[in-house]
């Protein structure tokens, strides 16, 4: 089985356990997903927001006080399946990196990494779920009404199955309906109107998965390079301000000469 279900950490339950006001049986923990018992492959879908409410970071894993375990986030849980790792495999902290298989993922802070967004909403290709379900054994409403089999999944000539579109791909199933309110503001926008920096949760996780697959990461700038950039910009600013100052002095001198000549003309009527 290569399926991962989305799960959540119940923050209220976790808080009660931390305060020792509740004792929840670990055996009943299903991470708010009724399908968890079918495979026990779960990924947490609770990314952290920054202070401005924008989502820029991703947690490789989250610790559950209920189960006393580290649980991989959704993107990492899917990659566990892709790389053939155990379901509960989590990234390991090592210096300034998280180690995940043979990947070295730069850390932003102790617990998170930065997401290198590939674009705004709609960057990753989408396929309607009904087009996947519509095989020779499933009747859609359109097929019933028209009396014709469409079978977009497995029709021989142009079906999605024979197209190879899903071969060796990581496929995420999620809602792209605004009514479901699974929208996250990110640091990347189309720039056409206010609020077009929103992407759906399924797209959010797709970005970190693609980052890891392609090794395309964002790193925090080192303190040394920050200092060099500050010194460089300071020197440039000083040079530009000095140059402008000299120009102003020259212009001022020319203005004074022009005024002196004008006064001479006025006095002597030249």
Where in the sequence are the language-model features?
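Non-transmembrane functional regions of envelope-associated proteins
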Residues: 1-108, 166-250
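Short, solvent-exposed coil/turn linker segments
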Residues: 11-13, 128-129, 145, 154, ...
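Flexible, solvent-exposed extracytoplasmic
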Residues: 78-80, 119-123, 162-165
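A Trp-anchored, charged/polar loop motif used as the substrate-binding/catalytic surface
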Residues: 133-161
